[in-house]
């Protein structure tokens, strides 16, 4: 592994945008589909080159991510340790590239035939690791996501940017 010495566009990779929340919900057409209390809102973008290995890595990283405060106010606890919930929402725009011009390109986003099953496997794996159901949005729908950030704490995890 080497250090990246200049900004680069990464390969088509699975990306998570994780927000620590007091609460969050997702609706479609004014109808609430899912709601959580304290926990994590996770936006998931699947890239064209993603594998089950990428999905496994991110699911494990997500549930072990220590971004909740312990008794000393130090971010030292994971979502399981605080009894938190996880809301997973698909978001292909996490795969946007803005290198050329001002209009985002989504050619790095996996097509639905690839991304939907990967998203579903990711959500199922997170539920398995948490030992509880994981609420979701509606894949491919125009959703409205409401949240109250806690901190705010927002973390970006990329499946191709792993420790060696």
Language-model segments: residues:
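N-terminal amphipathic/basic-hydrophobic helices that include classical n-h-c signal peptides
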Residues: 1-13
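Short, active-site-adjacent segments that bind or coordinate small-molecule cofactors and metal centers
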Residues: 135-152
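Compact, glycine-rich, soluble single-domain proteins
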Residues: 31-83, 94-124, 129, 135
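Signal for well-folded cores of large energy- and translation-related assemblies
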Residues: 22, 63, 123, 127-131, ...
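Residue-level signal for inorganic ion chemistry
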Residues: 58, 89, 153
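Short, low-complexity, polybasic intrinsically disordered segments
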Residues: 108-109, 150-164
């Amino acid at each position: 592994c080497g250090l990246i010495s200049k900004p680069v566009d990464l390969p088509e990779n699975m990306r998570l945008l994780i927000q620590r929340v007091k609460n969050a919900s997702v609706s479609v057409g004014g109808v609430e589909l899912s709601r959580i209390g304290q926990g994590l809102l996770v936006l998931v973008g699947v890239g064209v080159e993603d594998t089950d290995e990428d999905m496994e890595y991110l699911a494990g990283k997500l549930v072990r991510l220590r971004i909740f405060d312990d008794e000393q106010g130090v971010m030292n606890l994971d979502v399981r340790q605080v009894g938190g919930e996880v809301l997973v929402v698909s978001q292909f725009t996490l795969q946007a590239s803005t290198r050329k011009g001002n209009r985002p390109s989504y050619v790095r986003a996996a097509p639905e035939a690839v991304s939907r099953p990967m998203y579903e496997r990711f959500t199922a794996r997170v539920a398995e690791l948490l030992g509880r159901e994981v609420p979701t949005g509606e894949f491919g729908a125009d959703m409205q996501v409401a949240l109250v950030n806690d901190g705010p704490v927002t973390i970006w995890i990329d499946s191709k940017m792993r420790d060696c």
